[in-house]
UniProtKB/Swiss-Prot annotation:
It comes from Neisseria gonorrhoeae (strain ATCC 700825 / FA 1090). This is GMP synthase [glutamine-hydrolyzing]. It comes from the Bacteria. Homodimer. It catalyses: XMP + L-glutamine + ATP + H2O = GMP + L-glutamate + AMP + diphosphate + 2 H(+). Its EC number is 6.3.5.2.
Length: 521
């Protein structure tokens, strides 16, 4: 199926992928590539328009230059922050360090233009935006006009109406820019003329065809974790190749309470997929003994998964592929996306824990989808809502929710505490009757391998501490800690301390992302 496409060239901003998400929300297909994508590949991609992302560097650094031939393709170009500076610099304007950095909220006064017409916030011809820049455009290129300014940035927006080139010094992709989505939609839909044909039914059709082409008659093994991503991946691959897919559900001793039974029942009842249940708790615990470094734990868990899959592969004579539920944020955090300049934060279990000598080829049908798109895909594939809207669970399971060394004792305590937390979130509603489980995007307990003094009855206790974590996010790229009611937190704390022998203190994590990540390890 032929569809209109937008190309995003990434200069290294940590929020570039939000641009892709906003474009897809307009039902237009887009791809994100490194800023140095060769011009012949750009031409072959045949985009309706190009978006140049922000980035942390200066236009005067030679290592961060895109092919300026993009300005000769006869298609609209939108430069965001660094992208605007790159456009101005290479088209004859001037860029210089600002007298003061602009970071955070700003109000832009706009002039009527093809990009801004009819788009404003509370006051006429004003936009509430999010800035993050030091350098700024100090002189316009020929053919450009100013269409927006702030007191400290006289050229905050610029336009070449004839060539349909636009530059904006702020970030429309972040939610802090109130009309950011409207501006991006104006560029993508109206200026570029892209037709909104990218929908989940269309995506399923294309993904199924691609999987069939990749796999052929080979057999595929997929590891089920019980989480949303692997479940949706299994449904999509099963739609494409049916019984060529065998799912391997590995019980590594790091699952949530009663999860093994739930996963087996759910897949047998709802999907009809072949599932092999492997009890490997002893194998995983032995390998993790004495290991405290989170990166080493992740890689050990990844390596042990591969060992398990290798053992199962020998039983499947035609197995050639290992399928995973890797999604876009996983790839981004590991700096493994199609761009070269992302900054590595931590290795993800789906992309950073694979041994170099892995015998199976990798199949990752969800790697270009954001979490909300994965859920939408799951619903379109007919999966039950309770499965699709379950909170994310990491592949290493409780292994990255137990700080430091992983022990069976710790896992058993954490399982119980986590289950109590989730129960209370499901059973407690806000004033509109919505459960706090549905109001939060991800919630879980974390085991801290430290003991604190407590008093229970007439006796002194010296037991472990559990931290509760709950966040609200639309894309898992950034997140706010959930402001849960004190009464809810109090009930959770009381139940954990009274029902889980070995825990005598419960704390609540109030860190956002950034600066913290959602998972503790």
């Amino acid at each position: 199926m032929t569809q209109d496409k937008i190309l995003i060239l990434d200069f290294g901003s940590q929020v570039t992928r939000l641009i892709a998400r906003r474009v897809r929300e307009a039902h237009v297909y887009c791809e994100l590539h490194s800023f140095d994508m060769p011009l012949d590949e750009i031409k072959a991609f045949n985009p309706k328009g190009i978006i140049l992302s922000g980035g942390p560097n200066s236009v005067y650094e030679s290592d961060y230059q895109a092919d300026t031939g993009i300005f000769d393709l006869g298609i609209p170009v939108l430069g965001i922050c660094y992208g605007m500076q790159f456009m101005a610099h290479h088209l004859g304007g001037e860029v210089q360090p600002g007298n003061q950095r602009e970071f955070g909220y700003a109000q832009v006064k706009t002039i009527d233009s093809g990009l801004t017409r009819g788009i404003q916030d509370d006051a006429p011809n004003t936009l509430d935006v999010w800035m993050s820049h030091g350098d700024k455009v100090s002189k316009l290129p020929d053919g450009f006009a100013v269409i927006g300014d702030t007191p400290s940035c006289p050229i905050a927006m610029m336009e070449n109406a004839e060539k349909q080139f636009y530059g904006i010094q702020f970030h429309p992709e972040v939610t802090h820019t109130k009309q950011g989505r409207a501006l991006l939609n104006r560029f993508v839909l109206d200026i570029c003329g892209a037709q909104p044909g990218w929908t989940m039914p269309n995506y399923i059709e294309e993904a199924v065809a691609k999987i069939r082409e990749q796999v052929g008659s080979d057999e595929v093994i997929l590891g089920l974790s019980g989480g949303v991503d692997s479940s949706v991946a299994a449904a999509l691959i099963h739609r494409a190749i049916g019984d060529q897919l065998t799912c391997v559900f590995v019980d590594h001793g790091l699952l949530r309470l009663n999860e093994g039974k739930m996963v087996m029942d759910m897949f047998a009842r709802n999907l009809g997929v072949k599932v092999i249940h492997v009890d490997a708790e002893g194998q995983f615990m032995a390998k993790l003994a004495g290991v405290t470094d989170p990166e080493k734990k992740r890689k050990i868990i990844g390596a042990e998964f591969i060992e398990v899959f290798d053992a199962e592969e020998k039983k499947l004579t035609n197995a050639k592929w290992l399928a995973q539920g890797t999604i876009y944020p996983d790839v981004i955090e590991s700096a493994g996306a199609k761009t070269k300049k992302a900054h590595a934060i931590k290795s993800h279990h789906n992309v950073g824990g694979l041994p170099e000598n892995m015998k199976l080829k990798l199949l990752e049908p969800l790697r270009d989808l954001f979490k909300d798109e994965v859920r939408e895909l799951g619903v379109a594939l007919g999966l039950p809502r309770e499965m699709v809207y379950r909170h994310p669970f990491p592949g290493p399971g409780l292994g990255v929710r137990i700080l430091g060394e992983v022990k069976k004792e710790y896992a058993d305590l954490l399982r119980q505490a986590d289950d109590i937390f989730i129960q209370e979130l499901r059973n407690t509603t806000d004033e509109n009757g919505t459960s706090w489980y549905d109001l939060t995007s991800q919630a879980f307990a974390v085991f801290l391998p430290v003991k604190s003094v407590g008093v229970m009855g007439d006796g002194r206790t010296y037991d472990y501490v559990v931290a509760l974590r709950a966040v609200i996010t639309s894309d898992f790229m950034t997140a706010h800690w959930a402001e849960l009611p004190y009464s809810l937190l109090g009930r959770v704390s009381n139940r954990i301390i009274n029902e889980v022998k070995g825990i005598n203190r419960v704390v609540y994590d109030v860190s956002g992302k950034p600066p913290a990540t959602i998972e503790w390890e």
